[in-house]
Amino acid sequence: MRFRVILGKADDLKADVLFQMSVPASAETPLALEGFLTGPTSTRASTLPVHQKIRIHSQRVVGEGTEILGHSILTEPAFWTPNVPMLYFVKCRITSSGKELALLSQTTGLRRLGIRNHSLWLDGHRFVLRGVTCSNRDYSSAEQQPAAPEDHRTADVLDLPAEVFSETDSVELEIDENLKTADEIGRPIIIRLHPKSPPSVIPSVICRLASHPSVFLTVIPNTLLPEVSKFSAYKGTMLFAKETHAKFAPPELPNGIDLAVVRLSQSVPDSSWKTPPPYPVIAWQTGVPSQRQECDRLQALLANWRTAPKGPPSSWDWAGYFVGDETIPHQA
């Protein structure tokens, strides 16, 4: 069953939360939904729990299945941030004439992530994304846990191998358990899809990734860019990025892509980047260690470049900084 959480109109007092469920079976009679939203829980904070009913907002036949849209209203909602990773638990049971068709139990988080001008904004504040490349790290082992509270804000950049994709709608990701742990500890995650990913399963993959509040950004390879408008509707508040190289002029982004990740093989970008593009840009320095302090070094280096003569306007700055080498090349 394909499932995704949609955060509607939300503020500190109230949040409209929608739950889209695609059941791979059509029924002669309308389906019934018994669902509840409970929480929040967090590894760093506590608050009074709620037990909110999920009601059917609408349902329709789509292809050979049925799509149900559930709805719940939360008062004084708790939103997910790296500092305070608040999580809710969703449990839904879908029946037809008393017969169970699908059962769902899943944790999720409500994350207010978006773009304002050239920056990322999280929960009403500018958020500079700093990340290091790594393999599919096992967060369940003690040695992989963050060494200090301030480290949880550093994102992991993960390459998603093509082997994790399935030709069925119930796509199982090898890193799913690690993403759940990242949700709990508040570590942002950047996902790079494999260039050989089959387009037919991408909507299910995007729904799966978007259900994890820790997954801030998914990098779409060039091979999937022609299809991006078809599956961008599934991403919710998760952002899509395109990779490019700093030796080329800033590209025009396809519809559905929110920002660019610019690869730096030299110390500074081409001079054409001193005229900022109309979208956020994250700088990625390869050939350096995958360490948090390298993000600071890159930020200082690019700050000098930015303030040099004929540099970008003082109101512009980079939206984030990645360091380290990738394991899956996206470009030749």
What are the language-model segments listed below?
Residues M1-I191, P199-D258, R263-A332:
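Secreted/periplasmic carbohydrate-active enzymes, especially glycoside hydrolases
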